[in-house]
């Protein structure tokens, strides 16, 4: 009986960090499918962030950033802050219970492509002074879609 308890405790102890490590691998990994680059990361509070770059390095490139944050949607039009500078973006907020999902859409291809070039130079983007977008494998993204938001 004692061996079973020790084995069970060891299994729980070692499997929890293993599962945690498995979950972490899903963040900060770039994927590509149908000419769309996808990345998921998180805010400093642990809320998920989804970044999608459509048609990167083309004249039709655009960017969508969506993330969950605490609070209610209000009438104020939020701005997208990238590396300390405001980037022209269309803003939309969706209320989900006590939280909200902020969506930013950037349609200026030159701005989007400069962000892609910046990331491909192995630099990290900082969005909203809180969200780090890592370059990691953006030069050789995995094929497929990111995990569910």
Regions found by a protein language model. Give the residues of each.
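Sec-dependent signal peptide recognition
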Residues: 2-9
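A generic "folded-domain core" signal
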Residues: 19-149
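N-terminal signal peptide c-region/cleavage motif recognized by signal peptidases
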Residues: 15-17
